Amino acid sequence: MRWNNHSGLEGTHAFLSASSYHWLNYTDEKLISVFKNKLAAQRGTELHDFASRCIKLKQRLPRSNKALNAFVNDAIGFNMDSEVLLYYSDICYGTADGIYFGKQRGSDRMILRIHDLKTGEIPAKMDQLMIYTALFCLEYGMKPGEMDIELRIYQGMDILFYNPKPEEILPIMDTIIRFDKIIKEVKTVEGVN
């Protein structure tokens, strides 16, 4: 048999793929809903890329009540870096949308700022940003009590602010260390790299 050539699609997955067979049971409405969610996720990725480019180029956006504009402008105003990978191990790491660590304006006290842009509809929680804070502390040998911490989530037309206490970050750091060790032990027993 001479197979048709589809080399341009290698490594990709069709929306209606055989390996994601659940669509066989979708109603038309469910199909449309799932596809729109996929489009929204793609748009979210594109918006994150756009925001990151604006921040890196120090290109402010027009003032508005949109989270994207506020996120970009605040990141530039606070001299933040965009898309910074925070690493504890190959098992635990993550990328912060916007991050800054340095002296606070008008103070000798250090501050860690982590901002996150959420483009979806599901209300966001601070847990992800608290994990980034723990990863920062672990990677750079910092103690949460040695600095001020400000976390922000930009979503829709809202900005959520949170200043976690060291007692909230320390257990996350401990969990990362413990779970990382457990996974490494399991990988050793299972002969997995």
Regions found by a protein language model. Give the residues of each.
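Accessory terminal regions of nucleic-acid processing enzymes
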Residues: 181-193
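Charged, glycine-rich intrinsically disordered N-terminal tails and low-complexity linkers that flank
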Residues: 1-50, 193
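Catalytic cores of nuclease domains that cleave nucleic-acid phosphodiester backbones
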Residues: 33-113, 120-127, 139-149, 159-164, ...
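RNase H-like, two-metal
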Residues: 154-158, 177-180
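Short, well-ordered amphipathic alpha-helices
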Residues: 130-138
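Surface-exposed alpha-helical segments enriched in charged/polar residues
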Residues: 73, 134, 174-177, 181-184
